[in-house]
């Protein structure tokens, strides 16, 4: 329980610090801050991707890796499993969390939807870093239609 609170507090402070110097950054400044958060998440995802699958058998398919992310990685970071995983079986996966912990503290009003991307960049990097460590290049994006529901889209280009 304490580690969850500490992680959420640390994440909130990282976001606040990156936006503190310029509360209303232009598109370039906001893009840079999102990139920094995504980079931090990528490095954490790499470390977790190395450490967590030690007890797991080798992954046979991409889908097995994504199931690992939805179950084991999500539990390790957020103490809950991802709510759903969907795929088109062509390299696109949609992971949905109906009560994403980093968005729960935000009010559910529409005015807060524009603030949501800065609270999702770290997690996009986390997923991309874990996938990279497990041998899968990917592009991860996030979207929020209604708080605190969040969808992460993972696109794995076919080589």
Swiss-Prot record:
Gene3D superfamilies assigned to the protein according to its UniProt record, in alphabetical order: Trafficking protein particle complex subunit 3
Annotated compartments: Golgi apparatus, cis-Golgi network; Endoplasmic reticulum
Pfam families: TRAPP
Gene Ontology cellular component list: cis-Golgi network; cytoplasm; cytosol; endoplasmic reticulum; trans-Golgi network; TRAPP complex; TRAPPIII protein complex
Main location: Golgi
InterPro entries, per the entry: NO_sig/Golgi_transp_ligand-bd, TRAPP_component, TRAPPC6/Trs33
Source superkingdom: Eukaryota
Family statement drawn from the similarity comment of this UniProt entry: Belongs to the TRAPP small subunits family. BET3 subfamily.
Quaternary structure note: Part of the multisubunit transport protein particle (TRAPP) complex. Heterodimer with TRAPPC3. The heterodimer TRAPPC3-TRAPPC6A interacts with TRAPPC2L. Interacts with TRAPPC2L.
Known role: May play a role in vesicular transport during the biogenesis of melanosomes.
Protein's UniProt name: Trafficking protein particle complex subunit 6A
UniProt source species: Homo sapiens (Human)
Gene name of the record: TRAPPC6A
